[in-house]
Amino acid sequence: MVRFESTDSLMLARQLPNKTVALILAGGRGSRLKDLTATRAKPAVHFGGKFRIIDFALSNCLNSGVRRIGVITQYQSHTLVQHIQRGWSFLNEEMNEFVDLLPAQQRLSTEQWYKGTADAVCQNLDIIRRYDAEYIVILAGDHIYKMDYSRMLLDHVEKGAECTVACIPVPISEGSEFGIMEVTADYQITAFYEKPANPPPIPGDPSNALASMGIYIFNADYLFKLLEEDNNTPGSSHDFGKDIIPQLTARKVVWAHPFDLSCVTSNAELPPYWRDVGTLDAYWRANLDLASVTPELDMYDRAWPIRTHMEPLPPAKFVQDRSGSHGMTMNSLVSGGCIVSGSVVVHSVLFPRVRVNSFCTIDSSLLLPDVHVGRSCRLRRCIIDRACHIPEGMVIGENADEDNARFYRSEGGGGVSDSGYAGKVRGKIEPLGFLFVRLDLLIRLSLLIRLNLFIRMNLLIILTLFFKLASIQASH
């Protein structure tokens, strides 16, 4: 758990959240998640069985004592807005606690949508000023982690910083996917590079680079001045990582905050857990992380609960089918409302209301809400999108050629099906990769399989009649 150096530090850390407003940037499309974000914003994507991705940032705010929160939305926001209204409306407005939705509005002063992360905040400055906060915490709404923001606030105040950026070491091979910083011994940021082609390594640790987590703390008045300057700067992309943070390094007013100082964990022996689930590969792996025997992210820690909208669902059920086969699961997460009948589920995540019929094997797969799996199916290393009905007898993830003809795969950057319905998978997972399956493609496949069964049954009837007639003629 997070530790404080003294009682005075602890007391100050408890006071600072009351002077703070958190702004969660939740308007991104998340195009690398392909069809998972075709109809919903990335922070609204399902995760870990019962949660949405944004629940982690929201829960971190509440658990840290930051109870004034603005959620900035834009792309496909309906699902996200609905989730927040249903699951996060319990804060006490009389105590000045709230989750405020800030959609893109194309105000009179600008007819454009949000042009970047900084512009998303800038276009809401009139609202944010009325919050009357001393400190602004800016968060990405699409990361999976548990963090005590009060500890980062304390670090920000004690160093006298105008801006503080949370940081974490990442493999040098992945550094080009993040904002990378160089720091002094006391973590003052001296240089910042947004997604550099050749990221500089950490001194003394050539295998890692120091990456930004997309978490910023600003003194409120200083942030307002910065955003107004950036808004009037020709050629700016109006982005924190590309424009705001790099210019602050020259002013020597920005510090880094190591994530291990504020990471919340129930097991000090495990490394700090933070995942950017911006690709299907990363999303699939992060979900299955939770199904491991000892996951690095403890979802059962009562001291730091992850809250979400709770649907009134019955418990998951594992039943015996008519043949006597028992439904069973191993190293998996199975959500409320699921029924597994005479099938085996291994190292997988079943989201709410999933139905798995008899004689199926589900291995290393994610079945999103309302998926229905017909009898005798075998699914391996798949992501099955919401409300898909897998037809009886379908096998996915065992034959590379067949999968390439029907779905996008992750092997060698993904195979594109002629139909173009399934979401392309980025990255490579051995040996076969995993597949992303969408409803509209499965409808076509289901019709083909049913037609095939119809032809086979009629052929069997014809052959039976033929042999009967032949036997009658032979008897005469």
Curated annotation (Swiss-Prot):
Homotetramer. The lineage of its organism: Bacteria, Pseudomonadati, Pseudomonadota, Gammaproteobacteria, Enterobacterales. It comes from Yersinia pestis bv. Antiqua (strain Antiqua). It is an enzyme of class 2 (transferase). This is Glucose-1-phosphate adenylyltransferase. Gene3D superfamilies: Hexapeptide repeat proteins, Spore Coat Polysaccharide Biosynthesis Protein SpsA, Chain A. Involved in the biosynthesis of ADP-glucose, a building block required for the elongation reactions to produce glycogen. Catalyzes the reaction between ATP and alpha-D-glucose 1-phosphate (G1P) to produce pyrophosphate and ADP-Glc. Belongs to the bacterial/plant glucose-1-phosphate adenylyltransferase family. Its EC number is 2.7.7.27. It catalyses: alpha-D-glucose 1-phosphate + ATP + H(+) = ADP-alpha-D-glucose + diphosphate. It holds the Pfam family NTP_transferase. Keywords: ATP-binding, Carbohydrate metabolism, Glycogen biosynthesis, Glycogen metabolism, Nucleotide-binding, Nucleotidyltransferase, Transferase. InterPro entries: ADP-Glc_PPase, ADP_Glu_pyroP_CS, GlgC_bac, GlmU/GlgC-like_hexapep, NTP_transferase_dom, Nucleotide-diphossugar_trans, Trimer_LpxA-like_sf. Pathway: Glycan biosynthesis; glycogen biosynthesis. One of its GO terms (molecular function) is ATP binding. Alpha-D-glucose 1-phosphate binds at Y114, G179, E194, K195, S212. It comes from the Bacteria. GO terms for biological process: glycogen biosynthetic process.
